[in-house]
Amino acid sequence: MAQEVLKDLHKVRNIGIMAHIDAGKTTTTERILYYTGINRKVGETHDGGATTDWMEQEKERGITITSAAVTCFWNNNQINIIDTPGHVDFTVEVERSLRVLDGAVAVFDGKEGVEPQSEQVWRQAAKYDVPRVCFVNKMDKLGADFYFTVQTIIDRLGAKPLVMQLPIGAEDDFDGVVDLINMQAITWRGKTEIGTDGTIEEIPADLQEKAEEYREKLLETVAESDEELMEKYFGGEELTIEEIKGAIRKLTVNSEIYPVFCGTAYRNKGVQPLLDAIVDYLPNPLDIGEVNGTSLDGEETLTRKPSVQEPFSALAFKIAVHPFFGKLTYVRVYSGQAIPGENMLNSTKNKKERVGKLFQMHANKENPVEHADAGNIYAFIGLKETTTGDTLCNPDNPIILESMDFPDPVIQVAIEPKTKADQEKLGTAIQKLAEEDPTFTVQLDEESGQTVIGGMGELHLDVLVDRMKREFKVEANIGNPQVAYRETIRKKVESLDYTHKKQTGGSGQFAKVIVTIEPYNPDPEELEEGESATYKFENAVTGGRVPKEYIPSVDAGIQDAMQYGFVAGFPLVNIKATLEDGAYHDVDSSEMAFKLAGSQVLKEAVAKAKPVLLEPIMAVEVVTPEEYMGTVNGDISSRRGQVFAMEDRSGAKVVKAKVPLSEMFGYIGDLRSSTAGRANFTMVFDSYAEVPSSVAQEIIEERTGSKA
């Protein structure tokens, strides 16, 4: 029998578990589920039995791809956990999870410290202001170094860690932790069976001095956060445990500090204190307080408090296909209450929805509930129009909550069904997968007639194609990966005049526009909410020379024309268009005429604006033994890469470089063979940059030649 969802929001935690791939976050989640009584048998990532890894591909690959939502209970508190992927190709899963969470556990590998993907996920968490506690995992690993890992949190993340525990021993001799608040040791000696509670002991004599030093630092941090505590502490009085914990909680909720704990989830050491920390220090929905949104017309700012007395509002953050129920929509309810069979409004799309069943989820198992209340995470069944990032609300009190930004895909492949039956199944598969994943894109290449799918990396597309085969039984031929090139302009073209005129008897078509286009590279920090970083349209028409009902048509026409660039037919980006003037005709002007004028003026302007080709550049980090440094650097140079930093890490060398994505296909095989399998690498998308003319010529010839 499933435990009831708690109504007291003080006792609810909505948290994510985030990390670099292989830092051990799925294993940490599995242990949490075991200790909280959800799992009778513990799952292991390496044998494909992890509860939160429920897709076939996840079980095979031993990595987490989708964010499974799991509800569990610890000491009469409810913890809703989202297990997020650590592989860079799946950053969208991390992004959409963080948007709806109140707090997170950042898991670090005790040997590697902060790794590239940890940095990216940390930045994403900072973007959504998510408070975090840190868990230094794998303390039993050869080379594990707790103090090094804490230093990397300072050096690489620019964060302020607050050490809450010290490790007792390391590697095979890791036996437990020193609890710096209670000044006692908690030990799990020898091989610890799953479910074993730690033993409370005296602090080992050889750690006593270090423990006192770190407790002093902890107390100073606490005292400095509050005037009363400062007076008490510097006046020589003892601070109580409640005062210390309360101050740390406040600092954590405000993201001023990040408490650090340690252990080894796989060896069952340190998990229970981490659960206590989640409850003690991470915020509940009431700490987060009200959320902001806008009215349907975007004119008015509205707020919703985390209370069932408020009008219903929720954000859909994930779509999944359930084998029995069909489409599952994961939602975070921010205010009010929903019940099965109720009508609601999808305010993002302005469409009515009716919710069927409501579930509290445990990975891919579901527990039906009779109502979905403010502050909790649920899965809704029966929503037809809702996709990721949409707001659901009470139709009588509409609100649009802040949505999510998703990056454009950087890699594409052509996909061709093998038979006519596969063609129909492919259409269904693509539609379902695109609903689930906003970074999965589909387009028809008009000249070749091929269906082209796009994603965030080779692994991302591999998994999607694999799912088409397994879940939708689609047999298809897949082309080689193609880079998602873009085009832009380098020169401003002012006041270009274009008149669209057609007279064929009866009413004709007439629209005149005068437009300036220029390069557009805004500072992301200065963008308003919802503003694009790659396109801006400004209306500077005065005196009604173009009626206001036709202005959006000019904008739409310009955006349509940006889908096919002048250089090689790739989409145009980083353009600002200003409509300065124009003219209309009472009878012959229409929305369509102004849309066509917008398209044509853009095409003519781009031709004069020095159009260039852009390519995605990846930030690459290679970890290699020192003897292969020369080989690695030489190989990066041969791929048009630029090395911008080198550093030492855990006895190895780290090479940081920026390399065009087009040069990185097959890199893992080349790197392994040239370093006897001893080096590895990670890469994340960095930016778009202009393609050198010699390389651009090849791309243009290949693109236009293949279409000839």
Swiss-Prot record:
Could you give a GO molecular-function term held by this entry? Answer: translation elongation factor activity
| Residue span(s) of domain tr-type G | 10-286
| Family of the protein in this entry | Belongs to the TRAFAC class translation factor GTPase superfamily. Classic translation factor GTPase family. EF-G/EF-2 subfamily.
Instruction: Write out the residues that bind GTP.
Output: 19-26, 83-87, 137-140
Q: What does this protein do?
A: Catalyzes the GTP-dependent ribosomal translocation step during translation elongation. During this step, the ribosome changes from the pre-translocational (PRE) to the post-translocational (POST) state as the newly formed A-site-bound peptidyl-tRNA and P-site-bound deacylated tRNA move to the P and E sites, respectively. Catalyzes the coordinated movement of the two tRNA molecules, the mRNA and conformational changes in the ribosome.
Q: Which NCBIfam families match?
A: EF-G, PRK12740.1-5, small_GTP
**Name listed for the protein in its UniProt record:** Elongation factor G
One cellular component term (GO) for this entry is:
cytoplasm
Q: Which GO terms describe its biological process?
A: ribosome disassembly
Q: Where in the cell is it found?
A: Cytoplasm
| Swiss-Prot/TrEMBL keywords | Cytoplasm, Elongation factor, GTP-binding, Nucleotide-binding, Protein biosynthesis
Q: Which InterPro entries match?
A: EFG_II, EFG_III, EFG_III/V, EFG_IV, EFG_V, EFG_V-like, EFTu-like_2, G_TR_CS
- Which HAMAP family does the entry link to? EF_G_EF_2_B
